[in-house]
Amino acid sequence: MDSIVTTEDTIAAIASAISIGKGGVAIIRVSGKDSINSCKKIVQTKSKYAWESHRVFHGFIQENKQNKFIDEVLISVMKSPNSFTGEDVVELHCHGGIIIVNKVLKILLSSNSRVRLANPGEFSQRAFLNGKIDLTQAESINQLINASNTRSAELAFSGIQGEIKKKINDIKNDLINQLCEIEARVDFEEDFTDFDYTKYLKNIKKVKEKIELLIENAKRNSYIHNGISIALIGKTNVGKSSLLNLLAKKEKAIVTNIPGTTRDVIEINLTINDIPMKIIDTAGIRETSEQIERIGIKKSFRKIKESDFIIYIYSLEEGFNEEDKKIIQEIPKEKLITILGNKKDLIDCKNINSNELKNTILMSIKNNDGERLLIDTIIKKCGLKQVENINIFLNERHLANLSACLSNLNDTDEIIKNKLPFDLLSIELRDGIQNLSKITGQELTEELLDNIFSKFCIGK
């Protein structure tokens, strides 16, 4: 955008993290056409650089006209259009205690009728509307703020630098080139008998491969940011709670030889290989008349459906029997699963049936023998063995629009295959381009934009 979108009101909010209630410095951000004048009303300063753009100067916050100072601050000014939002922006750097920062914000709001508290994500929304950032960059800022590990933060920062936009525009340009050739023929009513269908299908196949790779990466990098939920499933006394304690490096679950000890779900959050994981210990599955235990078993099956990954544990002493097979048949086919044979220290592994060994990890949870292999297997099956190859983070909104575009391109294949009118090709390509444009924010309704930015924190 070349022009700056102006709004009648000026917004203000605490822009720094204050979740623990105190810190060395807190920042109050003010944006809008009245930001400088509103701050002048509450700031006393003798600096010769006062209120110049891209200057930081010293001052005091004044509570009333009696010159009662309540805090000593640094003030930075960024005048339109050279600011994050594209508007005039002032940032007040005050001391970080929750009491004082709220006091400064209250004084600012009460002294200026044209200044109001910002809505969640409103600073970023104004930056987007003023063309300072595209929608993927705005979402990446929120992603970075909420990153739960360093890899997630790295992926978010690549989005801030415009990597998502680059990949989407690359695909979009490919489709625009195809659309131009087709529409030129439609507009001039040229004969399509000499149209190179093979070349077109080859080009579209390349575009679809790019989209499919992004979709595949989107599924994997969701694990990086949101974590992998892993349910420990199996019969009673096979070592589920012991495995939970082993992974947690502390006793989180009670372990006894009495069947049915675990009657409720126990969850712990860990970070392994810089990937967040939620480990879920469930009640042992068996036939029982005990009501509380039966409730726990129902929860076990519920967690099977809710989890990303299943570790099915059985005892090598007992072997993998019909009861185990029956339980595994209850696990949805699409679920990622690893079968773990526990208590290898109690048997001679040479005597294990070769069919039982297939796709099974042998482990002694008691002796911590096999933990590394188990973790490596989880990471490999989740497609995270080479996370360095994943260089952008795509969220569910991006994924939905990419999938819609892919559907449009598949429809063009059907149009050619069934020799349908050529103008239908143009329609599908236009729809595909529109779905890609929604990702960067070029084709979105105001209502949808409000919904996206409402998920941001206040102050960003």
From Swiss-Prot:
GO biological processes: tRNA methylation; tRNA wobble uridine modification
GO (cellular component) term, any one: cytosol
Assembly mode: Homodimer. Heterotetramer of two MnmE and two MnmG subunits.
Annotated EC: 3.6.-.-
Pfam families in the record: MMR_HSR1, MnmE_helical, TrmE_N
Name of the protein in question: tRNA modification GTPase MnmE
Compartments in which it is found: Cytoplasm
Function: Exhibits a very high intrinsic GTPase hydrolysis rate. Involved in the addition of a carboxymethylaminomethyl (cmnm) group at the wobble position (U34) of certain tRNAs, forming tRNA-cmnm(5)s(2)U34.
Naturally occurring in which organism (per UniProt): Prochlorococcus marinus (strain MIT 9215)
Gene Ontology molecular-function annotations: GTP binding; GTPase activity; metal ion binding
